[in-house]
Structure formats: structure tokens, C-alpha cells
């Protein structure tokens, strides 16, 4: 009997079984495009997969989203990605990048401009509105004002040097002889002179009563006023000598040095504190927003921002606190995500539109690239199936030999 009966069927089965997968894959993809003869499309062109690639892409996306990337799997994946250690490392990296940015003069200038705009908007827009809203409350700044009064104004007392300087300023700038003379003239009106004369006549006793009723004060006060008007320099010289004779600087210094709110009665102090608080609150209600806005417009915010960034750049405390800050922020995010991660994922999944992304990616891949990818998977991951196909083909060939020998 011829040798080919024993050899050809097993070898043919082996070859067919081994290369069937490659042939089947090529038949699914090829040809890549349609061929036409006289405008008539040849059947089975293009291949099955290129012809139905859009529908296949949607089916692949549906399968992946329905079986692999389910909301539960995405939720678990997000939990793994957003573990505290990873979030802390990410926040630490961001803070490090921000600090490195401050070391670059050009980038620091850009950051300063951004920070300046933020500070200006906060001070010129947000803060006035906040003050306007808070000022409507009856207790607005009540605590700070009371604390300021109790700890600063109530304890305020001038030392000897401060009292001396203030007394000199009062006598030389606020109340010099010229001002005293003018105030005296303004005070000695006809009406005031009449009132003083009558009061003196009514209250004088003893020898003063005789002087008051015989001579009175009216003529003396009229002459004093006339002298101050007609001889201003002489009147000022007299007032200056009078201040020296009574040692006004020393006396005023002693008065100022001994001046303290603690010497007032408790009721007077409380009333003064209440009046101060009400005055500040009323002023802030009426003029506070405009004053704050005007103050903000007069500030060079870019310079302020540069100073702040300079302090932050050289702050050892900030650099040493980066780990602690990142850990605290990570814990805050973790508590927030534990509560709202599921709802966030339900909102994020439609926004991501993963099924459409997968379908678009499949549609954007050429049939040749798809074929190459599947062939690579078969060779690397499914080689056992290829070998099994060859083995089955060989066994089928052996069975055929048995049938031929019968």
C-alpha cells in the first residue's frame, strides 16, 4: 500500500488545525475595503468586522460597561485610587510645586499678580458687603470693642515724658495765647457778661457781696473784652505771662499723667464704654463699607502680595508643616469622600461617558490594527489553543488513515 495513505492525512490535519485560527481571523478582517466590479460590490468585501465595525464598537462598549466597568467596580477603583496615603502624597506634591514656583522670580511675579487681584477683590468687594450685613446685628463687634476698652483704654496712662510732650503740644499748638485770647473774646458776649454779672450778684456773700452790688463784674468784663480786641498783642503777652506765673506746663503735665479712666466711677466707665461701642457701631453701619473700600483702593496690593509670598518662601515653619498640612487635608478629603463618594461617582460616570469613549476608540482604530492586536493576543496568550488545534487536526488525520485501511 502507498506510503502517502499513512503520512498525508495526519500531516494535512496537523497543518489545517494549526493554521485554522490565523485563517479564521484573516477571513474576519480581510479584505479591509469593499471591491466593486462595474459598480457592483463583490460579496464578503470588506470583511465581516470592517463592515460592521460601528455596531461592533457599540457592542464592545456595552459589554465592558455592563460586565467589567460597572458602577460598583468604578466605585471600588476610586476607593483604591483615593486612599489616604495617595491623597496625602498628591497634596504634598502640589504644595512642593507651589513652593518651588515661589523660588522662581518670574513665576513669583505672576503668582503675586494673581494673589494681588484676589486680595483686592476680597478687600474692595467681599469685605464691605460682609461688614454691611454683619453691621445690622446689635451685637456686631461688641466683644472686641469691650475688650479693647477694658484692656487698652481703661489701662491707658501716660508716663512722665508722654505727659510733658502732650502738655507742650497743647500749650504751643492747640491753646497758645493767641487762641486763648480769641476764645476769651468769643466767650465774653453781651449775653454771657450779663449772665455772669447776675450770677455773681446772687451768689456773692460777705465783703464780696458789697463789691458785687456796688461795682459788679459787667464793667470789668467789658473792659477786658475791649482790651483783648484793641490790644491783641498786649493781651496775648499778659496771657503768656499768666501761664508762666501759674506754671501751666507743669500743672498740665501732672493732670495728664494722673488722668485715667480708672479714676472715674464704675457707672461712668460703663456709660463711656457703651457710648464708645454705640458710636463705633453706628459709624461702621453708615460709613464702614465706603471707608473699607476706599482704604482698599489706596493699598498697593501687588506689593502686599509680594511681601506675603516672600514671607512664605522663607518661612521655615511653613516648610516644616507641609507634611502635617497634607495629612490634615487628606483626612478631610477622606471623610468627605466616605460620605459622598458614591453619589459623586453616580454623577461622574455620565459625565465621563465611558461607553462612548470606548466606542469612539474602537471606531478610530483601523481594521489592520485590530487584526494585528488580536493576532498578538492569540500568539501570546492563546498559543495553547493553536497547539490544540494542530493536535486535533493530527488526530483527525489519523482517524482518516484508519478508515482508509479498512
Swiss-Prot record:
Membrane-protein topology: Multi-pass membrane protein
Keyword Zinc-finger: no
Record keywords, A-Z: Cell inner membrane, Cell membrane, Membrane, Transmembrane, Transmembrane helix
Subcellular location: Cell inner membrane
Transmembrane segments: 1-21, 385-405
Family: Belongs to the UPF0754 family.
PANTHER family: UPF0754 MEMBRANE PROTEIN YHEB
Name assigned to this protein: UPF0754 membrane protein CYA_0973
Organism: Synechococcus sp. (strain JA-3-3Ab)
